[in-house]
């Protein structure tokens, strides 16, 4: 197939074209990004250095924090730098790389959240066999499945996009490169391809969301004969995960489970699931988890002690 395109770069509209608001955007998203990096890396360091946090749940949480770090980094730095640029330019290859990064890390996180729900199910419904079932080798395999799934999803999406004829215009009505805004710039009819993107992206969101719902329905049914105290204790194990699932899945389903249409609210939704959710994940897991908070305090005391020495 011959690659036909005249466009070598794209111009991003950004979040706002108001100079004052662009300065506000710079400050706000720089702070958000710094909190995201520090929070997620703190989780990674805390779990990897603490012997008390060696269960499969924390193994998965480490990988979730790593994914959140790189996922946010696929769009936040460009948005921050562009806040001071009158003309927000991104090369064709850079645009495709950004779209690819967004989809590989986003899809991997979706699958990993589903894996974490299955871990939660085993912990609550089969506690006596938990360590036997959730062996370290199985945990590694499940994380590998998440990454392979994300890789296949993103690769299929981008291979269909990179060969499309972009003849102009080259102005993307977004602050980052994403498939739906890009498809609006293609010189041919993209209705069929748009349906494929919706099916591919929407399917991975919806399928994993349904698996999550089924997992929690089974968990709730298994707890119906337990005491109220027992139910509360069991559910507290997974409530943080439920919050993260809702925060991440609802915006993704809203954006991708529809035809090739872009709405004014899409940019705000994209900010939420690419920057706000990765920032909130460490907060959600830390505030509701006494073991993580205790490990962070021990890590901090160890650092203070070493500094004093």
From Swiss-Prot:
The keyword Transit peptide does not apply. Residues 1-23, 78-98, 157-193, 257-267 are extracellular. The chain crosses the membrane at residues 24-47, 56-77, 99-118, 138-156, 194-217, 234-256, 268-287. SUPFAM superfamilies: Family A G protein-coupled receptor-like. Coiled coil: none annotated. Signal peptide: none annotated. It is a multi-pass membrane protein. GO terms for cellular component: plasma membrane. It is found in: Cell membrane. Disulfide bonds join 95-187. Keywords: Cell membrane, Disulfide bond, G-protein coupled receptor, Glycoprotein, Membrane, Olfaction, Receptor, Sensory transduction, Transducer, Transmembrane, Transmembrane helix. Glycans are attached at residue 6. GO terms for molecular function: G protein-coupled receptor activity; olfactory receptor activity. It holds the Pfam family 7tm_4. Residues 48-55, 119-137, 218-233, 288-309 are cytoplasmic. CDD domains: 7tmA_OR4A-like. Odorant receptor. Belongs to the G-protein coupled receptor 1 family. This is Olfactory receptor 4C12. It comes from Homo sapiens (Human).
């Amino acid at each position: 197939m011959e690659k036909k395109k005249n466009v070598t770069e794209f111009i991003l509209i950004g979040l706002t074209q108001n100079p004052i608001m662009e300065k506000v955007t710079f400050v706000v998203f720089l702070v958000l990004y710094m909190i995201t990096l520090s929070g997620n890396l703190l989780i990674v360091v805390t779990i990897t250095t603490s012997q008390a946090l060696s269960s499969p749940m924390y193994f998965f949480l480490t990988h979730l924090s790593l994914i959140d770090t790189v996922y946010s980094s696929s769009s936040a730095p460009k948005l921050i730098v562009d806040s001071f640029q009158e003309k927000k330019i991104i090369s064709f290859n850079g645009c495709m790389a950004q779209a690819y990064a967004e989809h590989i890390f986003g899809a991997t996180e979706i699958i990993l959240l589903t894996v974490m729900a299955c871990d939660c199910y085993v912990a609550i419904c089969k506690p006596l066999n938990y360590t036997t079932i959730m062996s370290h080798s199985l945990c590694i395999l499940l994380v590998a499945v998440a990454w392979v799934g994300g890789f296949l999803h993103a690769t299929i999406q981008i291979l269909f996009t990179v060969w499309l004829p972009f003849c102009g215009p080259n102005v993307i009505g977004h602050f980052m490169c994403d498939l739906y805004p890009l498809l609006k710039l293609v010189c041919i009819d993209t209705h069929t391809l748009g349906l494929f993107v919706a099916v591919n992206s929407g399917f991975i969101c919806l399928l994993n969301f349904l698996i999550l719902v089924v997992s929690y329905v089974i968990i709730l049914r298994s707890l119906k004969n337990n005491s109220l105290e027992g139910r509360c204790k069991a559910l507290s194990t997974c409530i943080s995960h439920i919050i993260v699932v809702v925060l991440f899945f609802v915006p993704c389903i809203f954006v991708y489970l529809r035809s090739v249409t872009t709405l004014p609210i899409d940019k705000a939704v994209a900010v939420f699931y690419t920057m706000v959710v990765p920032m909130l994940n460490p907060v959600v897991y830390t505030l509701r988890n006494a073991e993580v908070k205790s490990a962070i305090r021990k890590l901090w005391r160890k650092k203070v002690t070493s500094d004093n020495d």
